[in-house]
Amino acid sequence: MRNTEAIECDFETFDPRGYLREYYQTIDFENEQLLRFFADCYRDVHPRSTLLEFGSGPTLYSLITAAASVDTIHVCDRLESNLREIQLWKRGDEVAFNWDPFIQRALELEGNSTVTRAELRRRAELLRRKLTTFCLCDAFRRPSLQGNHLNAYDIVQVNFVPESITSSLVAWERALQNIVSLLKPQGTLLLTALKHAMYYQVQEQIFPAVSIDETRVIQTLRKCGVREADVLMRTIPASPPYRGYEGIMLIEARFRH
């Protein structure tokens, strides 16, 4: 089993912009399915909900539809460099990554078949306003959040985090349980996870991963207090298949306690 220090060392050379170029330069099959997943999840969300994006990386795709549905969005990550990448976009910096294609496609999936430039700008500005808090986090600690944050959230989103920061099943389960502990009673967990991952790749760099599947996820969520009947899950194949994992699991879990 690898310890936390070793895991953190793996990410000292993580390049946020390289990661964005590797996975978000275009809207490929995987990104299309991710945008569809979030469009579906946010159709019936309470408008005064608070959302935590846990382990955001340098990305925004999962927050585009959320911005129109929730009251406030908090973002946390282990790396300050990832948070800075998002803050560049929030400030409208000319060197920020261009998320406009993702915003346009998200709006289309929400039902707007002819998205205008004005509508795209309005959604971007709405997301900028809803992004109110940035803080550091460590999934291996409880409490996991550092700095300015709430004690609990109505919605917690976590995209490709616990299985992508360790090669240990024990550490993966502990990290997921720590993240779930940030939910309010009767909160909602939106989880996307790599299936049967051996690694994931950013350009020439290889990062750790742990092999999990649908059964393992369900078992761990049950330990966290969610009923299997309250978990909606589907799996899509990896595309392209060479990235080190078999597929992507898209999971919505509603807690009732």
Where would I find each of the regions flagged by the language model?
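Class I SAM-dependent methyltransferase Rossmann-like catalytic core
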Residues: 1-48, 61
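A short acidic, Gly/Pro-enriched loop at the edge of an enzyme's catalytic core
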Residues: 142-156
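Short alpha-helix
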Residues: 117-123, 208-225
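Conserved class I S-adenosyl-L-methionine
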Residues: 46-59, 72-77
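S-adenosyl-L-methionine
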Residues: 91-145
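Acidic carboxylate diad motif detector
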Residues: 191-193
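A short glycine-rich, Lys/Arg-flanked "PGG" loop and its adjoining helix->strand segment in the class I
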Residues: 149-150, 170-185
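Acceptor-substrate binding/catalytic loop of class I
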Residues: 167, 197-216, 241
